[in-house]
């Protein structure tokens, strides 16, 4: 299973040799992780990870969704249910189930990330199987007890320069404060994710808004609600935040008058908002967040187009983030126009657009980002954060948006040990793509070196103000 040094490079010898040279120039660059979902408590408390299953299987919905698709219950993977039904607590049994079904992950990015971690973090080069499951479990478990496997030591070992968590608007950020107070050199910063207090279609929307204004000490009015967001954004900024993140069902924006927006707020805060009112409120809030970003400088990320909790049975029994979120078709040209009419020409605003609809890359997103000063294209996201997905992204966007209307790479993960693996993959695919341009005489090699460095490091650092 030993990692091939030419993985993800072209099979054509000349192009492969160019890719090798390019990759050698960026392989050791620091990791900028400007958007992700690791837990701040890991860095604050710096405690050992409990066991291999808790590290690799239970928190990784890429893993659990594949196993669930093959008929393995989430309970058998140690996922706790809301209704109190028993779930597997024996980490070794969970690991054995994972190992027995490792063949399911052939040709998936999950396999690339896992095997990279096995070799580079644990020194294990055997391919996981039913036969060696216990031996590999024991080897990992033994290392997890060692000081060099604690979160802070891994941060240094992975050569991470900065990492952003994703945090609710009302989060007190106590673990970020603990990291700062500890004097540790690691840069762990929050990102402002206000979805729970913005999505009027959620059953808990009203209570989340009440919580927001309560924490901020503002009245439960439209203006008080906006002031609460401003208050919390400043709270996040004081702890190092440089970005906000917005995971909406669509990319719809609106630019209502102050009176219409206030009346809309009064309707939705009473609960039981109509579908159209909920969508209009989300749309208005994207524009309001853009307005706030111009004032406070937070980079704005929009992650639209996921049909969340598509499987109601799984959602009712297990809750959010259990692998049942599905990409859906997403429009940008018409839906973003109200926001762009208001702020799209303002260079003080940076809006990073992501999509789960690859058909929008060349038709909508690249032309939009290739024109509006306020827009940038986020990297291939979620289902397309893969070798083929990243390559499709480059091919579909570069001819219209170029490289410099993109923002480098986001690992966007909950799986801590996959962070260096994901950046390794992205750097290799980008170098392979650039090598092809050099081999086709569309780019000089000295230019390719510069672009490779920018894609691996500089663009993320610059765009996210890190």
From Swiss-Prot:
Pathway assigned in UniProt: Carbohydrate metabolism; pentose and glucuronate interconversion
Enzyme Commission no: 5.3.1.12
Protein keywords: Isomerase
Alphabetized GO MF terms: glucuronate isomerase activity
EC supergroup of this enzyme: isomerase
UniProt-listed InterPro entries: Metal_Hydrolase (IPR032466), Uronate_isomerase (IPR003766)
Record's signal peptide: none
SUPFAM superfamilies (UniProt xref): Metallo-dependent hydrolases
Entry keyword annotation includes NADP: no
Single biological process term from Gene Ontology: D-glucuronate catabolic process
Similarity comment: family membership: Belongs to the metallo-dependent hydrolases superfamily. Uronate isomerase family.
Protein's recorded name: Uronate isomerase
Organism of origin: Brucella canis (strain ATCC 23365 / NCTC 10854 / RM-666)
Phylogenetic placement of the source organism: Bacteria, Pseudomonadati, Pseudomonadota, Alphaproteobacteria, Hyphomicrobiales
Gene that encodes it: uxaC
